[in-house]
Amino acid sequence: MSRVGNKAIEVPNAVKVDIKDRNFISVEGPKGKLEYQFNHRLIITNENKVITVKRPNDEIFMKKIHGTTRALLSNMVEGVSKGFQKTLKIVGLAYRAQIKGKQLILSLGFSHPVSVAIPDNLEVVVNQNTEIVIKGIDKQLVGEFAAKNVKLRKPEPYKGKGIRYVGQYVRQKAGKSAKKTRKD
């Protein structure tokens, strides 16, 4: 059984945490501000720059959301203090990326360029037309936007063409072997 929910969250000095109505949490730091409303049955306290999450009983539902709530709070604190980043790499001949305004334009071998709207809370940078860096304070939003772009053209197993996370291993398959002809 996981004990994630029992760990306390240390809050850096630059981060300010406000708890309203026992379940509405506002976390503000140098990178920005995040707000979230958690389950009202959990007891969340902030004492001496340490956040603790307690559950009132050992019901199965309470056990499930206890660890999840603690992880979400930890991600909020880390996001407003350090931020989150995901880097994508585009592999393939003539596969390119560029930014026009609040749109990410991808050329991925389709008959048309693919346009993806960049959310307001994210910063997207394209390096050398083949590397996309996604930065933001909300871990979920950064991950969703990265996954959405990878899904547009997943790496294929023969040549590895597509969009992948930097450091992701793409397993390569052997291509068809030539048919042997017999000479008599």
Swiss-Prot record:
GO terms for cellular component: cytosolic large ribosomal subunit. Coiled coil: none annotated. Keywords: Ribonucleoprotein, Ribosomal protein, RNA-binding, rRNA-binding. GO terms for molecular function: rRNA binding; structural constituent of ribosome. GO terms for biological process: cytoplasmic translation. InterPro entries: Ribosomal_uL6-like, Ribosomal_uL6-like_a/b-dom_sf, Ribosomal_uL6_a/b-dom, Ribosomal_uL6_bac-type, Ribosomal_uL6_CS. It holds the Pfam family Ribosomal_L6. Belongs to the universal ribosomal protein uL6 family. This protein binds to the 23S rRNA, and is important in its secondary structure. It is located near the subunit interface in the base of the L7/L12 stalk, and near the tRNA binding site of the peptidyltransferase center. NCBIfam families: L6_bact. Part of the 50S ribosomal subunit. This is Large ribosomal subunit protein uL6. The lineage of its organism: Bacteria, Bacillati, Mycoplasmatota, Mollicutes, Acholeplasmatales.
